[in-house]
């Protein structure tokens, strides 16, 4: 089944797994494998259901609980994910406070991204900021270990430790949190937070109850409202942008976000640096040209990439709101390289924006991602295309 999944034969992989489950329905590894196959196909709801079945075979298994929580967060089911992680955190400490104390980036980053997809900017910004603080703590705490390591004379481990500290900002969780925080800052700049309106449309987190013997510091701003009011300006992102420009030059999404942040701030120099990294380090000259507002010559574009076609379609819509982007995105579909599911979703949104025909496009994408229709429904449930 794993080999079939690697070859993108989703139906064949699921058939093998169903046969195995019929033989041994109590083997949770089969459910985990099925969840991964479904996730790769875009069927995130069915993937979460498979993880639920695996987790319920042994509720005391922490790995299964964390995997189930992450699958729920992919679907935007934040409240249910909170309930799942409560199985193994301390009973006398609120779940979110405990996860923050544990520096659980694996939960906080996807949870923040789920809030972002919902449009809940304050809570998303709060969690992204928590993760950024974790990495600051990692760097600051290193100084407690220098003397200890030298006293123990474990110089090989010390050498590895120094290299690990140098690379801490290259971590994928840091990049995702940094990009998410910048997006939140841009959203707050475009539409400043109306606290009264937010309180009317969202249920605020109640204050925690201190049980006897429980020692923890209250989070006085669990919903991020005070944080947005105090540190919700574009200038707050200066340090984050500096780290991304140093350690994430090869991350295309990070460079696009830095460019958008710098353009909104009016920082021409930073825009040029981000575009140069996209062009020279990420090897995406079309992305750099599009962001800089340069005209992309259609004849010179490699149309075997759906990502390139999306850029052409967006350029056509900019120049002419009634442009036919359907043919740009779908012509000679069979000659294209296999696109990523995120590119497929972005192309779907472009078609919807241009009021194009989306049903045939979804049918084409399902040749690659059997669960794409489900993926679109989940994304559009929270996001406006």
Predicted segment positions?
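Acidic, Ser/Thr-rich low-complexity linear motifs
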Residues: 94-102, 137-153, 194, 291
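"A position-specific structural signal for the A-helix of alpha-solenoid helical repeats
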Residues: 33, 67, 108-110, 117, ...
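Structural motif corresponding to the intra-repeat A-B loop/turn of tetratricopeptide repeats
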Residues: 6-7, 41, 75, 118, ...
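Residue-level signature for tetratricopeptide repeat
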Residues: 2-3, 37, 69-71, 114-115, ...
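Short coil turns that delineate tetratricopeptide repeat
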Residues: 25, 59, 93, 136, ...
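Acidic, serine/threonine- and proline-enriched intrinsically disordered linkers and terminal tails
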Residues: 182-234
């Amino acid at each position: 089944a794993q080999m079939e999944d690697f070859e993108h034969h989703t139906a064949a992989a699921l058939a093998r797994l169903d046969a195995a489950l019929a033989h041994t329905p109590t083997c949770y590894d089969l459910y985990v494998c099925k969840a991964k196959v479904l996730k790769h196909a875009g069927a995130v709801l069915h993937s979460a259901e498979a993880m639920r079945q695996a987790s319920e075979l042994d509720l005391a298994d922490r790995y299964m609980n964390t995997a189930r929580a992450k699958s729920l967060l992919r679907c935007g089911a934040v409240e249910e994910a909170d309930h799942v992680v409560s199985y193994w955190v301390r009973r006398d400490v609120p779940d979110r406070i405990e996860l923050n104390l544990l520096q659980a980036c694996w939960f906080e980053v996807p949870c923040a991204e789920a809030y972002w997809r919902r449009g809940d900017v304050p809570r998303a910004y709060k969690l992204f900021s928590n993760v950024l603080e974790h990495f600051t703590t990692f760097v600051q705490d290193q100084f407690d270990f220098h003397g200890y390591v030298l006293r123990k004379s474990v110089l090989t481990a010390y050498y590895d430790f120094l290299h690990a500290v140098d690379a801490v900002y290259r971590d994928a969780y840091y990049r995702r949190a940094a990009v998410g925080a910048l997006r939140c800052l841009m959203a707050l700049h475009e539409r400043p937070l109306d606290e009264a309106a937010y309180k009317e449309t969202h249920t605020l987190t109640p204050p925690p109850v201190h049980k006897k013997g429980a020692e923890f510091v209250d989070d006085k701003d669990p919903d991020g409202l005070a944080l947005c009011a105090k540190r919700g300006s574009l200038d707050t992102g200066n340090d984050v942008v500096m780290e991304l420009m140093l350690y994430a030059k090869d991350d295309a999404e990070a460079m696009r976000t830095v460019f958008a942040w710098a353009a909104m701030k009016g920082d021409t120099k930073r825009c040029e640096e981000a575009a140069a990294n996209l062009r020279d380090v990420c090897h995406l000259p079309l992305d750099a040209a599009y962001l800089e507002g340069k005209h992309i010559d259609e004849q010179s574009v490699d149309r075997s990439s759906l990502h390139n076609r999306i850029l052409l379609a967006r350029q056509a819509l900019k120049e002419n709101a009634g442009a036919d982007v359907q043919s740009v995105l779908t012509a000679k579909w069979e000659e294209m390289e296999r696109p990523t599911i995120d590119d497929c979703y972005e192309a779907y949104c472009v078609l919807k924006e241009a009021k194009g025909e989306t049903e045939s496009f979804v049918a084409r994408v399902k040749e690659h991602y059997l669960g794409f229709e489900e993926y679109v429904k989940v994304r559009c449930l929270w996001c406006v295309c």
